[in-house]
Amino acid sequence: GLDIWVDKEITTADSAEIDFKYYGGSDKYTILVCLNDKNKYRAELNGSPVEINERSAGIIEITLGGDVKGGKLCVCVKE
């Protein structure tokens, strides 16, 4: 929660673009994104693919290393 600051967020039912900064000191942290449960998703951080875990339909879990101090996270429908 309080270790991540969202500078900008653009969301639709099927996608999310999130500009964020991480201020914590943990070795890793997790971001959850909730989108339409009818689709399968992929994610990119600063244009590079990142691994996701779909906790349940539409709930996208992205775990990043603590050395990732921010960037642009994009989650969109897998093509």
Residue ranges, per PLM feature:
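Surface beta-strand/loop "capping" patches
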Residues: 1-27
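Intrinsic-disorder/low-complexity, polar/charged segments enriched in Ser/Thr/Lys/Arg/Asp/Glu/Gln
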Residues: 15-19, 28-30, 59, 72-74
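Surface-exposed beta-strand/loop patches in extracellular or lumenal glycoproteins
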Residues: 21-39
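Short strand-turn-strand beta-turns centered on an Asx-Gly dipeptide
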Residues: 44-48
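Short, surface-exposed loop motifs enriched in S/T, G, D/E and P with embedded aromatic residues
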Residues: 50-52
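C-terminal beta-strand-rich structural cap/linker in extracellular carbohydrate-active enzymes
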Residues: 54-79
